[in-house]
Amino acid sequence: MSNAKLPVIIAGAGPVGMVAAADLVRQNIPVLVLEKNDALSSESRASTFHPPTLDMLDDLGFANTLIAQGLKAPTVQYSSSEDGVLGTFDFAAISDLVRHPFRLQAEQFKLTRIILDALSGNPLFSIAFGSEVKSVEQTSDTVKVVVTANGHDTTHECAWLIGADGANSIVRRSQDMEFEGFTWPERFLVMTTPVDFTALRPGVSSVSYVADPERWYFLLRILGAWRVMMPVAAETSDEEALSEAYVTASIRRIVPAELDAPILHTTLYRVHQRVAANFQKGRTFLAGDAAHINNPLGGMGMNGGIHDALNLTAKLGPVINGTADESILADYDLQRRTVTMQAIQGDTIRNKKNLEAKDEADRARFRDDIRAAAADSEKGRQLLRRIAMLDSLERAGALHVAEHHPG
């Protein structure tokens, strides 16, 4: 065991960092969370929690409170602009595999607030807001984290550091861990509107993907509104894409002119597919967006990050508590990086290509695949296992670097 002052420091108080903190505290391990902002983020960002993620949050005691603040989506639907609905899939078909057979639509800030409320006052938990990681150095038994707060630098020492500090991770950069991948040329425009798509499109699911060779779109229902996502061509400037004229023209592609279509909020963002070359370097780990980012089609980014966090803490906790050998930590990189590359990156890229396909053969293949899954219960179940991220979790659990020995 290290002589470091703290067992674990976590950089970042987003959903990934806070889930990691909660599970370590559950294992009676003291944790310090460093958050560069002055408070928890109130941005919506990710808003989908998949069935196995809800099961994990239930094990930590947070699921019921989160579910009460969100909207259950029992089905997911795939359509095409040419052929209409291709297939609707009910998560009830995998109710024997999960305790929560639905997607939950709830903004990620709701989870971080729930966790902070639960951990506040616990002597094992501390959080420092307005504290930005400036640099990280490590030896064979200690990690030194230099933090800037109120214009002053402070050095913290710990045995283990978890970098959950987002896509621009200072932890990752300080350890010279490459962030390999690419940025899509187009951006994604998200428009939030109170338009009732259930009335406009009877039978529409709360999660609905619509393939269109000209301009695909994605409908996501949240409490009191819908989010509509569409791509924005590379040649369109950010200023134009956020203009009232452009946003209005975009929403009018799917909402008739005779209906009011007020826009409550718009967001335009660049979309990346990147994965860190390593998820572990010595005593430093990466999780969530610090380790991998992807397009949001499929809702796999935050969920994958939470899966990272709990995979890691399930290993790190026993190591710190002396019931497991440090050798088990090597499995974290193998398990989570492998499924990130094969499943999360692969599936999100495939989702985008299916929706935007212009070649008739590619579009026909997508239509045929969805229709086949809708017509065959076993194929439908396989689709649900994949999109709910059950397959990636199972795949990760089967990977091991070597035999491990008790500590």
Model-identified regions with their sequence ranges:
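A conserved short coil-to-beta-strand element within the FAD-binding core of flavoproteins
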Residues: F129-V143
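Beta1/beta-strand and adjacent pyrophosphate-binding region of the FAD-binding site
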Residues: S2-V16
